[in-house]
Design a protein with these regions (language model features):
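S-adenosyl-L-methionine
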Residues: 1-55, 60, 63-91
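A short, conserved alpha-helix within the catalytic core of class I
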Residues: 98-111
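Conserved beta-strand signature within the Rossmann-like core of class I S-adenosyl-L-methionine
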Residues: 113-126
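Short, glycine-/aromatic-enriched active-site segment of Class I SAM-dependent methyltransferases
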Residues: 125-137
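Class I S-adenosyl-L-methionine
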Residues: 144-185
Length: 185
């Protein structure tokens, strides 16, 4: 199990690259005709998306009440309630320490331009081969197969995902999806 110190530093070696990609992805998705609405379901101690609040709506969430988030709920519960209340977001960012899988089914239903998913579960899955099959339907932990798993899963909800960018760092990786709904095709 990762120590708290390791968890807090997991972004250290790639944080600037991650933030630069977030900037580029937002510019890629953004249209000037309306305000962008962003959900950061796991915002952490330094919520990245809050710097974009001018001219946009940013909803931050983290279970840790000491963190400067607007809400403090388990992300999977929050995303489920947002779906049930028919909220929609232009961008949904799922960046947990582990896997975003618990949020995916509802997150895909509430985002209409971009979905960002970070996976930090590689270390745990390497030591337990059955987890790759249970979580992602593949025999071994293979990022590209996991991406395909989520693309297929999104289709079940009538949503087409197209990979905009996929990046890997040591035991963590992140995928940026352009969301193609019938209204955006």
């Amino acid at each position: 199990m990762l120590s708290l110190e390791q968890k807090m530093d997991y972004n250290k070696g790639h944080i600037e690259e991650k933030y630069n990609l977030n900037d580029k992805f937002l510019k890629y998705l953004e249209k000037e005709d309306r305000v962008m609405i962003i959900l950061d379901a796991y915002s952490g101690s330094k919520p990245f998306w809050t710097k974009y609040e001018k001219g946009r709506v940013v909803l931050t969430n983290d279970t840790n009440k000491d963190y400067p988030a607007k809400l403090h709920f388990p992300a999977e519960d929050l995303v489920k309630v947002l779906y049930e209340k028919e909220y929609e977001f232009d961008v949904v960012d799922l960046d947990p320490f582990n896997t975003p899988m618990k949020c995916f089914d509802n997150a895909i239903k509430i985002c209409n331009r971009g979905l960002i998913m970070t996976f930090g579960d590689k270390r745990g899955i390497i030591s337990n081969k059955n987890l790759a099959k249970e979580r992602y339907g593949c025999r071994v932990y293979d990022e590209r197969k996991i991406i395909q798993h989520y693309i297929r899963r999104a289709k079940k909800f009538g949503v087409k995902l197209r990979v905009w960018k996929f990046v890997k760092w040591k035991m963590t990786w992140r995928v940026y999806f352009k969301v193609l709904t019938p209204s955006s095709l």
